[in-house]
C-alpha cells in the first residue's frame, strides 16, 4: 500500500490518498472504509437524468471524477477488486449528484478517503504499508501419492492445487516422478518469492531432491518443514510452528494461530480468559485484558449497525488500550478467525481470572 498524502480536514477527519498495490491491500481497505465515509476517485458512469432514464441508450460510459458517501463495501476476492458503493455527493457533472454509484477499486487505483480513523484502522493502514516489502509464500505439502499447494496472503491461505495418484508398486501405480513433475509445474506457476515444502516422512525430501535437478532456481528458495499431515491440516502446522514467519516476518496468520491455540487451551483449563461481548467488556472495565482478540468481520458489522451486540465494540477496544492491553484483529478468512467467530467474535487473554 502506498499512502500518497494524508492531512486533517477542517472538520477533524483524515483525508488520505492511497494506492493499493496488492490484493491484500484491497482487503485491508475493506476494513478501513465503512458507511458514512467519503471516498473519491476517477471512474466511468452511464449518464442518468433526474427522471432516471439513461441519456445514452447505447450504454456507453463517460469518464468522470466522483465522491460518494459510502453505504456498502465488499471485498470481491475472486474478482480481484474492492467494491465501494454509495450516493454521489460531489462530481465533475452536477447532474449526477444524488444518484448511487459503485467504485470498482483494483490494484494501483488511486483513491481518496475522508474519515475519522479509529486506532485499529490506523494500525491496519500502517501494517499494509509495511507489508509491501514482505515476500509472498507458497506452501507445498506432500506425502506418498498426494500433494497440495497453498499460497499465503494476509487475508488467509488459499488452495491452488491438489494432486492425487497411486504411487509405489503395482500394475497401475503412477511413478513418483510424475507426481513430483506435476507438483513442480504447479510451483513454477505461483507468483511468489519463497516456498515451504512440508509433510510427514521422507517423501518431501525425495521431492526436494527431484526439484534440485529439475527446477534448481525454485529449489534454492525452498524451506523444508516436518508436519504430521498434508493439506489444510499440514498448512496449519506450518503456520503454528512459525515456518512462514521465517520467510514472511510480517504475516499475521501465524500469530493468529498461536493466539487461538492459547485461547482454546485456557478455555479448556478454565484459566485467565474471557469470551463473548459481555464477558470481554467486563474484563476491559476491570483492566484485566492482556490481549484482546476481535474478528474483523464482527468489527465491520457492529460499526455498520448490522450486528447484534448490546456492547459498543469501539468502547471495548479503547478501554483495553487505555488500560495497557494489546489488540489483535483476526481475519475471518482464516481458520483461527473462524474459531473466534464460534466464540462470539471476540475474546481476551487475561492478566488474572475474573470470579
UniProtKB/Swiss-Prot annotation:
<dbReference type="InterPro" id="IPR023521">
    <property type="entry name" value="Pelota_arc"/>
</dbReference>
<dbReference type="InterPro" id="IPR042226">
    <property type="entry name" value="eFR1_2_sf"/>
</dbReference>
<keyword id="KW-0963">Cytoplasm</keyword>
<dbReference type="Pfam" id="PF03464">
    <property type="entry name" value="eRF1_2"/>
</dbReference>
<dbReference type="GO" id="GO:0071025">
    <property type="term" value="P:RNA surveillance"/>
</dbReference>
<dbReference type="Pfam" id="PF03465">
    <property type="entry name" value="eRF1_3"/>
</dbReference>
<dbReference type="InterPro" id="IPR005141">
    <property type="entry name" value="eRF1_2"/>
</dbReference>
<dbReference type="InterPro" id="IPR005142">
    <property type="entry name" value="eRF1_3"/>
</dbReference>
<keyword id="KW-0378">Hydrolase</keyword>
<dbReference type="GO" id="GO:0005737">
    <property type="term" value="C:cytoplasm"/>
</dbReference>
<dbReference type="GO" id="GO:0046872">
    <property type="term" value="F:metal ion binding"/>
</dbReference>
<dbReference type="InterPro" id="IPR029064">
    <property type="entry name" value="Ribosomal_eL30-like_sf"/>
</dbReference>
<dbReference type="GO" id="GO:0032790">
    <property type="term" value="P:ribosome disassembly"/>
</dbReference>
<dbReference type="GO" id="GO:0070966">
    <property type="term" value="P:nuclear-transcribed mRNA catabolic process, no-go decay"/>
</dbReference>
<dbReference type="InterPro" id="IPR038069">
    <property type="entry name" value="Pelota/DOM34_N"/>
</dbReference>
<dbReference type="GO" id="GO:0070651">
    <property type="term" value="P:nonfunctional rRNA decay"/>
</dbReference>
<comment type="subunit">
    <text>Monomer.</text>
</comment>
<keyword id="KW-0255">Endonuclease</keyword>
<dbReference type="InterPro" id="IPR004405">
    <property type="entry name" value="Transl-rel_pelota"/>
</dbReference>
<dbReference type="GO" id="GO:0070481">
    <property type="term" value="P:nuclear-transcribed mRNA catabolic process, non-stop decay"/>
</dbReference>
<keyword id="KW-0479">Metal-binding</keyword>
<keyword id="KW-0540">Nuclease</keyword>
<comment type="function">
    <text>May function in recognizing stalled ribosomes, interact with stem-loop structures in stalled mRNA molecules, and effect endonucleolytic cleavage of the mRNA. May play a role in the release non-functional ribosomes and degradation of damaged mRNAs. Has endoribonuclease activity.</text>
</comment>
<dbReference type="Pfam" id="PF03463">
    <property type="entry name" value="eRF1_1"/>
</dbReference>
<dbReference type="InterPro" id="IPR005140">
    <property type="entry name" value="eRF1_1_Pelota"/>
</dbReference>
<comment type="similarity">
    <text>Belongs to the eukaryotic release factor 1 family. Pelota subfamily.</text>
</comment>
<dbReference type="GO" id="GO:0004519">
    <property type="term" value="F:endonuclease activity"/>
</dbReference>
<protein>
    <recommendedName>
        <fullName>Protein pelota homolog</fullName>
        <ecNumber>3.1.-.-</ecNumber>
    </recommendedName>
</protein>
Amino acid at each position: 500500500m502506498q499512502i500518497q498524502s494524508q492531512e486533517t480536514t477542517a472538520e477533524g477527519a483524515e483525508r488520505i490518498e492511497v494506492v493499493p498495490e496488492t490484493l491484500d491491500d484491497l482487503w485491508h481497505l475493506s476494513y478501513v472504509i465503512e458507511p458514512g465515509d467519503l471516498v473519491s476517485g476517477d471512474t466511468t458512469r452511464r449518464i442518468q437524468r433526474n427522471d432516471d432514464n439513461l441519456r445514452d441508450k447505447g450504454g456507453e460510459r463517460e469518464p468522470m471524477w466522483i465522491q460518494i458517501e459510502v453505504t456498502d463495501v465488499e471485498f470481491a476476492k475472486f474478482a480481484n477488486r474492492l467494491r465501494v458503493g454509495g450516493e454521489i455527493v460531489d462530481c465533475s457533472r452536477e447532474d449526477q449528484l444524488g444518484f448511487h454509484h459503485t467504485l470498482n477499486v483494483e490494484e494501483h487505483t488511486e483513491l481518496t478517503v475522508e474519515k475519522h480513523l479509529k486506532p485499529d484502522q490506523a494500525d491496519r493502514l500502517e501494517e499494509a504499508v509495511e507489508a509491501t516489502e514482505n515476500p509472498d509464500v507458497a506452501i507445498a505439502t506432500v506425502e506418498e501419492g498426494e500433494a497440495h499447494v497453498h499460497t499465503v496472503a494476509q487475508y488467509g491461505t488459499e488452495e491452488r492445487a491438489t494432486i492425487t495418484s497411486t504411487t509405489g508398486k503395482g500394475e497401475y501405480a503412477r511413478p513418483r516422478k510424475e507426481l513430483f513433475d506435476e507438483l513442480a509445474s504447479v510451483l513454477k506457476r505461483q507468483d511468489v518469492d519463497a516456498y515451504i515444502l512440508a509433510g510427514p516422512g521422507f517423501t518431501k525430501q525425495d521431492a526436494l531432491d527431484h526439484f534440485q535437478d529439475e527446477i534448481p532456481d525454485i529449489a534454492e528458495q525452498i524451506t523444508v518443514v516436518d508436519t504430521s499431515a498434508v493439506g489444510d491440516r499440514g498448512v496449519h502446522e506450518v503456520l503454528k510452528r512459525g515456518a512462514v514467519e521465517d520467510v514472511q516476518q510480517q504475516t499475521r496468520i501465524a500469530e493468529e494461530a498461536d493466539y487461538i491455540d492459547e485461547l482454546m487451551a485456557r478455555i479448556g483449563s478454565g484459566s485467565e480468559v474471557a469470551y463473548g461481548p459481555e464477558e470481554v467488556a467486563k474484563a476491559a472495565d476491570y483492566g484485566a485484558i492482556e490481549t484482546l482478540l476481535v474478528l474483523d468481520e464482527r468489527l465491520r458489522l457492529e460499526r455498520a449497525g448490522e450486528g447484534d451486540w448490546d456492547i459498543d465494540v469501539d468502547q471495548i477496544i479503547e478501554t483495553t488500550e487505555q488500560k495497557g492491553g494489546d489488540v489483535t484483529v483476526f481475519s475471518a478468512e482464516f481458520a483461527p478467525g473462524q474459531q473466534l467467530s464460534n466464540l462470539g467474535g471476540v475474546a481476551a487473554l487475561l492478566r488474572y481470572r475474573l470470579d
